[in-house]
């Protein structure tokens, strides 16, 4: 009997760990966004304001689903005590006002850095700056009742903002809590400005083209579908950066504390990006960019269809990796461990699909100069770019490994996620093969 029970009980690592986000929340976000895309294409709503409505159309159903279906506000991980009587307001008010001092100082510092960064006053960032300016006063006003209400319910209201407020007011504080607070808000301030800036462009690329323009040929259709996938990606990502809130259990648990992780991430985004223009990692020199495949395979219709389908599939996986987060997407942070969707295939679906997409779309070895040196150089540089994303993945894992939930997921993925399992086995074979060669050489 005992033996039968042991056989029936799943071994540790055989069952996929539970995902911190449900599959349903991303699906309802897709439905809301798709509905607005249909309306916008009918009425020609292709401008920046319509793109903001797209963010709202994506966010609203996800927030409703999160609260009414997933009941994330009741999750123990958000630190809110709904069962006990709230603290008396006079008892929690001092904590709230100290926290407000820290929070407002943080926002003021971010605004100052926006003013100092010249690139923020050029396109496409001007849209973000205008939106932040419009939101500033309402946000400051709304933060007062929000914190007064939240601090009466939080099990531990003295977070990083409170410790920063104590620092500013000359009270005792914990230095590491201040550092963690500043890391979280640096990430949010940097990436929200970028994501919001590129939302209108992707939105225009999806809504503005007519059906006749889209259906001109397979290359044009593929290009439109790829832009649509990126529109989904940036819209969901923007929602994620906006709604870092504890009542939604979408707060930041921790920000990556490693300098290597920040360096690997920041060189992939402006103004630090090294892959574009005259950057040292520009692998597109003398190519036709990400539309190169359409040129080089132009005389082969069947190949164009097959190649375009693969490119759309890769971009869809990339977008899916963001959609799976629901309202929690964020770079360089831990906001809950995902194990469903494309994360059941590999630990890094976005990086993998993106890098394969660059190879297949750009074809860096095909150059217009006819110079073999340019082909070799582009190929080598794209390999280096792949290495940068491998570096990003490893630094992210180093950060997330502090959470037992991620360690369980990583152990499961190594044996059961198809792509991760394959790569893990290949990795195990390399040193073994090297050892065999060394023994043979002896």
What residue spans do the PLM features occupy?
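Membrane-anchoring alpha-helices and their flanking helix-loop junctions
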Residues: 2-332, 336, 360-442
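Alpha-helical membrane-protein architecture signal
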Residues: 335-343, 352
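Short, conserved phosphate/pyrophosphate- and ester-handling motifs at nucleotide-, phospho-/glycolipid
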Residues: 348
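Transmembrane-embedded, aromatic-rich helix segments that form part
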Residues: 354-356
């Amino acid at each position: 009997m005992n033996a039968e029970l042991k056989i029936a009980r799943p071994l540790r690592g055989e069952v996929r760990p539970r995902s911190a986000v449900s599959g349903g929340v991303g699906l309802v976000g897709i439905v809301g966004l798709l509905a607005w895309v249909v309306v916008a294409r009918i009425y020609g709503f292709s401008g920046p304001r319509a793109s903001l409505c797209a963010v709202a159309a994506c966010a609203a159903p996800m927030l409703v689903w999160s609260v009414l279906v997933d009941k994330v506000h009741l999750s123990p991980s958000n630190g809110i005590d709904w069962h006990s009587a709230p603290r008396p307001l006079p008892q929690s008010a001092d904590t709230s006002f100290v926290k407000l001092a820290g929070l407002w100082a943080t926002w003021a510092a971010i605004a100052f850095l926006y003013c100092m960064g010249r690139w923020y006053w050029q396109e496409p960032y001007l849209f973000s700056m205008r939106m932040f300016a419009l939101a500033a006063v309402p946000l400051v006003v709304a933060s007062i009742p929000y914190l007064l209400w939240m601090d009466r319910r939080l099990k531990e209201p003295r977070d990083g903002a409170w410790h920063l407020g104590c620092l500013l007011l000359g009270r005792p504080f914990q230095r590491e809590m201040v550092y963690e607070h500043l890391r979280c808000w640096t990430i949010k301030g940097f990436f929200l400005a970028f994501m919001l800036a590129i939302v209108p462009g992707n939105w225009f690329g999806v809504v503005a083209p007519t059906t006749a323009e889209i259906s001109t040929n397979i290359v044009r259709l593929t290009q439109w579908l790829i832009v649509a996938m990126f529109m989904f990606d940036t819209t969901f990502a923007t929602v994620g950066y906006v709604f870092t809130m504890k009542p939604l259990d979408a707060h930041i648990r921790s920000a990556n504390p490693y300098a290597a992780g920040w360096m690997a991430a920041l060189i992939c985004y402006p103004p630090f990006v090294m892959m574009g223009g005259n950057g040292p990692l520009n692998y597109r020199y003398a190519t036709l960019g990400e539309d190169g495949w359409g040129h080089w395979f132009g005389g082969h219709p069947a190949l164009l269809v097959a190649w375009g389908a693969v490119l759309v599939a890769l971009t869809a996986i990339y977008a899916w990796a963001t959609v799976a987060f629901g309202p929690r997407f964020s770079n360089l942070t831990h906001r809950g461990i995902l194990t469903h969707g494309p994360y059941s295939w590999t630990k890094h679906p976005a990086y993998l699909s993106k890098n394969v997409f660059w190879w297949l779309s750009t074809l860096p070895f095909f150059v217009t100069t006819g110079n073999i040196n340019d082909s070799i150089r582009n190929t080598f540089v794209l390999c280096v770019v792949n290495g940068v994303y491998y570096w990003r993945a490893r630094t992210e894992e180093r950060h997330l490994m502090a959470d037992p939930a991620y360690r369980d997921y990583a152990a499961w993925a190594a044996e059961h996620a198809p792509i991760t399992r394959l790569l893990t086995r290949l990795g195990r074979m390399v040193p073994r093969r090297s050892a065999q060669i060394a023994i043979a050489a002896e």
